[in-house]
């Protein structure tokens, strides 16, 4: 399978959002690549701002490099398909994710985001060349997923982050009636909370920002207001001194990592470090326990 894309000789252009340095974004224009045999041309409809993109905007992830043409949580409409594409057609609503070759060791293990064959940096110098923040883009069909045409594009754009959450839930081995604490009620924290609830778990959300507390409560979750009580002690109180079966740390902070460990029950407690943080959060574990 050939993933190389040549610049179009037809002269068609694409416009896209690009981070050029900390706190500076531009709308740029480049040649729209040719649609290869395994590619699709997408008319983009929506793209979420991931922590990866926002962190780069804040200057917290500058190791990723500039200029950054990110945007991997996106959705759009198929406008053209390559001759080898059989599972998509013009007019399909699709969500985008990472692309994989399907045959390297990482892909065979299901880690297509770490594919050894496909690199998202482009030949014309753009880092993280997902181009989700564009009017049109060409994607390999391996990273495009058909969704219902009547699905709101804004909802379809959540397919990739939801997939990461479900992957984490599987790693945690969540079971019905378990108590799960989610530290952080941001977008990803609440998706984690909703997923744990769908597994049949009792979900407790810990948060300190008033607006996020209100949102979590409006969604029906038990909420610990960290401004009013110690979250570790409150979890112990709510679980009759036992602690949580699982903790999902959806905040990239050393203090959150420490709290998560202290919230866990002694036997078979599991913790998922879901959020990245910069500077890199520390995790200190007592190896004698």
Where are the predicted features?
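Short amphipathic alpha-helix with an adjacent loop that forms part of the alpha/beta core around
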Residues: 230-241
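Mid-domain Rossmann-like dinucleotide-binding core that forms the NAD(H)/NADP(H) cofactor-binding site
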Residues: 149-229
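Glycine-rich phosphate-binding loop and adjacent beta-alpha segment
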Residues: 253-289
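Residue-level recognition of short, solvent-exposed, well-ordered loop/turn junctions
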Residues: 36, 89, 175, 265-266
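Short N-terminal strand-loop motif that marks the start
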Residues: 1-75, 135
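Residue-level marker of beta-strand positions
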Residues: 73, 92-93, 106, 136, ...
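Glycine-rich beta-strand-centered segment in the early N-terminal region that forms part
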Residues: 33-47, 60-108, 148-150
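NAD(P)H dinucleotide-binding glycine-rich loop of Rossmann-like/cofactor-binding domains
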Residues: 103-183
């Amino acid at each position: 399978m050939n993933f190389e894309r040549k610049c179009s000789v037809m002269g068609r252009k694409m416009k896209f959002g690009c981070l050029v340095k900390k706190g500076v974004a531009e709308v740029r224009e480049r040649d729209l690549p040719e649609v290869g045999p395994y590619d699709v041309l997408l008319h983009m409809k929506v793209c979420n701002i991931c922590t990866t993109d926002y962190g780069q905007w804040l200057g917290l992830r500058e190791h990723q490099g500039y200029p950054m043409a990110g945007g991997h949580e996106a959705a759009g409409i198929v406008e053209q398909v390559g001759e080898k594409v059989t599972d998509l057609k013009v007019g399909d609503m699709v969500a985008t994710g990472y692309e994989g070759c399907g045959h390297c060791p990482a892909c065979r293990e299901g880690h297509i985001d770490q594919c050894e064959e496909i690199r998202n940096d482009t030949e014309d110098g753009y880092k993280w060349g997902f181009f989700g923040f564009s009017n049109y883009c060409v994607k390999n069909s391996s990273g495009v997923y058909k969704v219902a045409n009547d699905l709101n594009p804004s909802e379809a754009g959540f397919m990739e982050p939801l997939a990461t959450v479900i992957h984490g839930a599987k790693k945690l081995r969540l079971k019905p009636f378990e108590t799960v604490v989610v530290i952080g009620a941001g977008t990803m924290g609440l998706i984690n909370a909703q997923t744990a609830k769908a597994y049949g778990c009792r979900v407790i959300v810990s948060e300190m920002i008033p607006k996020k507390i209100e949102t979590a409560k409006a969604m029906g979750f038990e909420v610990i207001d960290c401004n009013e009580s110690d979250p570790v002690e409150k979890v112990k109180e709510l679980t009759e001194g036992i602690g949580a079966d699982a903790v999902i740390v959806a905040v990239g902070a050393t203090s959150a990592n420490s709290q998560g460990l202290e919230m866990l029950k002694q036997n078979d407690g599991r913790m998922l470090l879901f959020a990245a943080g910069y500077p890199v959060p520390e995790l200190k574990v007592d190896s004698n326990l």
